From Swiss-Prot:
One of its GO terms (biological process) is response to antibiotic. Gene3D superfamilies: 3.40.50.12230, NAD(P)-binding Rossmann-like Domain. Residues 314-687 are annotated as: Dehydrogenase ArnADH. Homohexamer, formed by a dimer of trimers. It holds the Pfam family Formyl_trans_C. GO terms for cellular component: membrane. It catalyses: UDP-alpha-D-glucuronate + NAD(+) = UDP-beta-L-threo-pentopyranos-4-ulose + CO2 + NADH; UDP-4-amino-4-deoxy-beta-L-arabinose + (6R)-10-formyltetrahydrofolate = UDP-4-deoxy-4-formamido-beta-L-arabinose + (6S)-5,6,7,8-tetrahydrofolate + H(+). In the N-terminal section; belongs to the Fmt family. UDP-L-Ara4N formyltransferase subfamily. Residues 1-304 are annotated as: Formyltransferase ArnAFT. The record marks 102 as: Transition state stabilizer. This is Bifunctional polymyxin resistance protein ArnA.
């Protein structure tokens, strides 16, 4: 059986050797180049492949069309991934008739994602394991071929647990690979209700919070000790790294972080105390705890903690134009929750952001970007990150008001881009999935997909080309004027506060809002061209988390990047979306407040949108850039998003009805009182 292998790390070496022993015909091995900045404690897949006389490659982007073509030419029967760091695209996985299989370092569905060995130790788990599963679009979510359990002892560290996992992987693969070669093994679907997902860890995650229990801190030490950078704390400006420790069940009345003794070196925790067995200063030697106390001048009663700031760090100032919009108000909530940001916002309304108006880190002005140009320029100069979120982004307006779309979406935003260039400010610009137009790629890739639009007489493309031209202008300013920028492309973000029902009444809203209005009013749900168009819907909370990471921009990783933000696993036709919405509506607790369902009605696009409209059959994002740059993966299922969106609008309608009824009741009472008073006055006058 012909196999292609994607492998890295010790586990990759184990997998490669197991495949050879099982008699697989390995056509090629793909791995990663060894980074000089990485403390490499594991074996080299490239060396093992060379020793086995296997062709080995280490492309920067294995999902590039050139590499996809080369892989397809090899015509593999099956694909294996052993600790390879990148997701493989559908084109690669579909090139193997038997599919692709990945070895993951946990007992799936628990601990999907990055660094599972470190995370299980941080969280104090007593067991983990390895899982061989089929690869699907969603990371680590495919059906399971087999698992091997590994017990975690209280003395295990990341290194000792890694050794156990390597041995478990070897046993699992030696058992399964020969069977898979001869026949297809049964697959067990993962239980989504039991799934958990964890992101990457960095050296900064080793910072000790002494308020936590001694057990939790000791777990952190075990998880990041050698060969990792280690758990650390500070004595003033000096860094102290803890390599080995043990929790002590002692009762004390000291503040967390206080040194209780120096021989042994014991530090008070939020619950119990931690004995530092070995450690070192940042520039010192690896020594015993008591020796470390001597070398660093640690005395009983002194406190360890975070590194004191040289100066109080100013909050990052973020300017959001269109702050009251769907993305703007949700992003504001996320930024303010983090407490490292100060938000300045402008919009023509404030109904969605009234909940932030009392926050001292939120500053709002009601205004129009086409009028308040001086205010905007001043705040671009004042702020650090600029997000111009103002745009007309509803399809019916592209044909109904094409010139207004161009004036607002292109001309007004171009002024903002130029001010960012003028004052050397970073711009995070909302491109759109619409720029891909009628692209015929299976997945729309930021760096390689063609941007294809229709003829001039199809005016619906004015939005797409306005955004595309701004993308190109921003890119050119980056190349020629060193403008710092990131372009993000949302793919059908959806959730509470998306448009409003009043906008839906005049047809100026996105699909789900229009569908909800039909249900609320008891009118037929109109399915344009039968609702067969497919879209990949993304929960607003998933989307905002990705956008937050773009604004955060760790190590400048997002500078000069274009990033799709969408959920390829949440693909559904508009008809399927409507049917799902109807099911949620019928079982909602407020259903009795609304009329009976009036059915579906198919309608031609020209009758709904007018002449000049042209639709797209599908729009599926590649999210490799988002995974690689942001360490981001969408998690929220479509049905959950639909339920939350529906619930938001239904409760709003019922509340509005109750307020209206209360107002009518109060008015009736008032009128009745006036009548009674008038009658009393007449009676008194008569007397």
């Amino acid at each position: 059986m012909k196999a292609i292998v994607f492998a890295y790390h010790d586990i990759g070496c184990v997998g490669l050797k197991a495949l050879v022993e099982a008699g697989y015909d390995i056509q090629a091995v793909f791995t990663h180049t060894d980074s000089p900045n990485e403390n490499r404690f594991f074996s080299s897949v490239a060396r093992v492949a060379a020793d086995l006389d296997l062709p080995v490659f280490a492309p920067e982007d294995v999902n590039h069309p050139l590499w996809i073509e080369r892989i397809q030419q090899l015509q593999p029967d099956i694909i294996f991934s052993f600790y390879y760091r990148n997701m493989l695209c559908d084109d690669i996985l579909s090139s193997a008739p038997r599919g692709g299989f990945n070895l993951h370092g946990s007992l799936l569905p628990k601990y999907r994602g990055r660094a599972p060995i470190n995370w299980v130790l941080v969280n104090g788990e007593t067991e983990t394991g390895v899982t061989l599963h089929q690869m699907v679009k969603k990371a680590d979510a495919g059906p399971i071929v087999g698992q091997h359990k590994v017990m975690i002892s209280g003395s295990d560290t990341a290194l000792t647990l890694h050794t156990k996992m390597r041995d478990a992987a070897n046993e699992l693969l030696r058992d399964l690979l020969p069977k898979m070669k001869n026949a297809s093994l049964p697959l067990e679907p993962q239980k989504e209700s039991e799934a958990s997902c964890f992101g990457r860890r960095t050296a900064d995650d080793g910072a000790i919070d002494w308020q936590k229990s001694a057990l939790a801190i000791n777990n952190l030490v075990r998880a990041v000790t050698e060969p990792y950078p280690g758990a650390f704390s500070y004595l003033g400006q000096r860094k102290l790294i803890i390599w080995r420790s043990q929790p002590l069940d002692v009762v004390h009345s000291k503040l967390a972080g206080t040194v209780l003794s120096t021989s042994p070196l014991v530090v008070a925790c939020g619950d119990g105390a931690l004995e530092i067995i070995t450690g070192q200063g940042e520039e010192g030697l690896y020594v015993q705890g008591s020796r470390l106390a001597q070398e660093m001048g640690i005395v009983t009663g002194i406190r360890l903690g975070n590194k004191p700031s040289q100066k109080l760090k100013r909050r990052t100032r973020v300017l959001i134009l269109g702050v009251n919009g769907f993305i703007g108000n949700h992003l504001t909530e996320r930024l303010l929750r983090d407490n490292r940001y100060e938000v300045y916002g402008l919009d023509i309304g404030s109904d969605a952001i009234c909940r932030f108006l009392d926050n001292p880190n939120f500053h709002f002005v009601e205004g129009d970007i086409s009028i308040h140009s001086e205010w905007i320029e001043y705040h671009i100069k004042k702020c650090d990150v600029i997000l111009p979120l103002v745009a007309i982004a509803t399809p019916i307006e592209y044909t109904r008001n094409p010139l207004r779309v161009f004036e607002l979406d292109f001309e007004e935003n171009l002024k903002i881009v130029r001010d960012c260039v003028k004052y050397n400010k970073r711009i995070v610009f909302p491109s759109t999935s619409e720029v891909y137009g009628m692209c015929d790629d299976k997945e729309f890739d930021e760096d390689s997909s063609r941007l294809i639009v229709g003829p001039i007489n199809k005016q619906r493309w004015i939005y797409s080309v306005s955004k595309q031209l701004l993308d190109r202008v921003i890119w050119a300013y980056g190349a020629k004027e060193n403008l710092k920028f990131t372009l993000f492309r949302p793919f059908n973000w959806m959730g509470p506060r998306l448009d409003n029902l009043d906008a839906a009444r005049i047809g100026s809203s996105r699909a789900i809002t229009q569908l909800i209005l039909n249900l609320v009013e008891g009118s037929p749900i109109k399915l344009v061209d039968g609702g067969e168009q497919k879209r990949c819907f993304t929960d607003i909370h998933d989307g905002i988390e990705a956008l937050f990471r773009i604004i955060e921009n760790r190590d400048g990783a997002c500078d000069g990047q274009i990033i799709n933000i969408g959920n390829p696993t949440n693909e559904a036709s508009i008809r399927e979306l409507a049917e799902m919405l109807l099911r949620c509506f019928e079982k909602h607790e407020l259903r009795h407040n609304f009329p009976p369902f009036a059915g579906f009605k198919d309608i031609e696009s020209s009758a709904y949108y007018g002449k000049g409209y042209q639709d797209v059959e599908y729009r599926t994002p590649s999210i490799r850039n988002a995974r690689r740059i942001l360490d981001w993966q969408p998690e929220i299922a479509l049905e959950q998003t639909v339920m939350e969106t529906l619930d938001f609008f239904l409760r709003g309608v019922v509340l509005e009805q109750n307020v209206l009824e209360q107002n009518v009741l109060e008015q009736n009472v008032l009128e009745q009182n006036v009548i009674e008073q008038s009658k009393t006055s007449k009676d008194e006058h008569h007397v």
